[in-house]
Amino acid sequence: MRVLSSPQQYLFNLETTSSQEAKRLWRRKIKESWDYECAYCGSDNHITIDHIVPRSKGGADFTKNVVCCCSSCNQDKSHTPWEEWYFSQEFFSLERYAKIKEMQLG
């Protein structure tokens, strides 16, 4: 399944004509690409989207900067650099880490 690079791409490709709908569609595609499981811990409970580089630190709404994330990991990670936070977690998985890095590199 192909996830476009940003919500705006859904507008440009005429998949929708509403910017709100474009963002909803983009977020849904992100979740689908991760099989509705948290990229960090693998949970499928209360799934949301996490900016790998937080928006407060310059991160943007680009597919390479977001992952599917459970609300627990999202709150716990907060504004901490993701690798620093992830390496310190008991549930750290080299397989999930590699998938996140691969997604970042595109």
Q: What spans do the regions from the language model cover?
A:
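Histidine-centered nuclease catalytic patch
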Residues: A39-C68, K77-F87
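Short cysteine-rich loop/turn motifs with clustered Cys
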Residues: Q20-T48, C70
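Short microdomains enriched in Cys/His and/or Lys/Arg
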Residues: G58-S72, Q89-M103
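A generic structural signal for ordered alpha-helices
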Residues: Q8, E15-T16, I30-K31, T48, ...
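Residues that form generic nucleotide/phosphate-binding pockets
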Residues: K29, S33, W85-S88, I100-M103
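A boundary/linker detector
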Residues: M1-R24, L94-G106
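Intrinsically disordered, low-complexity regions enriched in Ser/Pro/Gly/Gln/His and often acidic
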Residues: S18-S19, R27, Q75-S78
